[in-house]
């Protein structure tokens, strides 16, 4: 009987250790999901534009979830900036405090990706060989 109790206690101890390990893993995953992340990146424009050539940023590897806010800015002196927020289907470039004409971008969100396109490469933030930086919060 003592040997059976000892075996039962060993099994209970092993089960308790496994439960504690899973609880710790679950708590860690909950913290990871709750912590806001900031991602900074850059790209070089390829000159394409329009619906068949959208610019896409994928945050799967960097944020691991959809971004809550994305800002894209030209580094090449024209000071254009594009702001993207989930749920937006359109966004326009801005220059300092001014709206820039003919820069309407159609925006789509899919999983951890955001894509946009405009009728011009500069409006789409994709001018050939121009440098762009972005940051995303997620």
Q: Residue spans of the language-model regions?
A:
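Intrinsically disordered, low-complexity segments enriched in small/polar residues
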Residues: 41, 97, 115, 130-132
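A generic structural signal for short, non-catalytic loop/turn and secondary-structure boundary residues
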Residues: 33-36, 109, 129
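Extracellular attachment/recognition segments
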Residues: 56-117, 124
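Extracellular receptor-binding modules and their adjoining Ser/Thr/Gly/Asp/Asn-rich linkers
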Residues: 31-78, 134-138
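Fibrous stalk/shaft segments of extracellular and virion attachment machinery
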Residues: 1-40, 49
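Short, structured beta-strand segments at or near domain termini in extracellular proteins/domains
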Residues: 120-138
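Alpha-helical structural elements
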Residues: 38, 104, 127-129
């Amino acid at each position: 009987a003592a040997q059976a109790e000892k075996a039962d206690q060993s099994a209970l101890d092993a089960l308790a250790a496994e439960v504690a390990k899973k609880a710790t893993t679950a708590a860690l995953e909950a913290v990871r999901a709750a912590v806001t992340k900031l991602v900074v990146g850059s790209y070089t424009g390829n000159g394409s534009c329009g619906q068949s050539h959208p610019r896409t940023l994928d945050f799967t590897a960097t944020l691991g979830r959809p971004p809550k806010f994305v800002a894209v800015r030209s580094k090449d002196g024209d000071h254009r900036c594009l702001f993207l927020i989930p749920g937006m289907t359109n966004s326009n470039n801005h220059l300092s405090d001014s709206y820039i004409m003919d820069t309407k971008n159609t925006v789509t969100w899919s999983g951890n990706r955001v894509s946009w396109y405009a009728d011009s490469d500069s409006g789409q933030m994709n001018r050939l060989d121009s440098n762009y930086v972005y940051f995303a919060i997620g």
